[in-house]
């Protein structure tokens, strides 16, 4: 979760799942791609509840097969909220949580490395988007009419987010990744995820900027790394 990336050729994730007779389930939030006409979420817990309603029956149907949750950018916070619902709902927990390019949700609001979009005029908001390494094409007038409101809503997801800690630290290991040229999120921000689990925490770096998913060689290198770091029962 976190990016609406459409992959037209087999990625390392797809190849790995095929070789293990596993499944790869991608989350596409309302307001994007095939769901672009649906109202967008502006509240992460609400989005997590909607995702939980979809995924919980699948996990309860097969309680023996291990699974991993993977989230990029604000998708990491979406998975944090989803995990709280999984734990409290008695649903089988993931064998591992993989997150990239976003601070731990426990980071105090005053230390978040961005400016709240509601305080920004259009020019300042575009500048903020550029600092997240957004593609310059979206700032063309004909495209900004669509992407401007979409990104305002996306920013609201993390601007207005209020952290509520889980009842206890999670029990699964957390594998984290920081992009080497990310203008916003640093290694220090990622290390704070360690406090959310009682299990092992690992942090590695990947080449590229915040949206390294759009650099296919880097994305595939990252995917290979994720696969190599999977728990034994998921390899």
What are these regions, as identified by a protein language model?
Residues 68, 72, 96-98:
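Residue in the alpha/beta-hydrolase core beta-strand immediately N-terminal to the catalytic nucleophile
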Residues 1-67, 103-124, 207-211, 233:
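Active-site catalytic motif of lipid deacylating hydrolases and related acyltransferases
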Residues 14, 79, 83-86:
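A conserved amphipathic alpha-helix that caps or lines the catalytic cleft of carbohydrate-
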Residues 1-2, 72, 178:
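The conserved beta1-alpha1 loop
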Residues 7, 56-60, 84-235:
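Alpha/beta hydrolase fold serine-hydrolase catalytic domain that processes acyl esters and thioesters
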Residues 71-75, 79:
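Gly/Ala-rich beta-loop-alpha elbow adjacent to hydrolase catalytic centers
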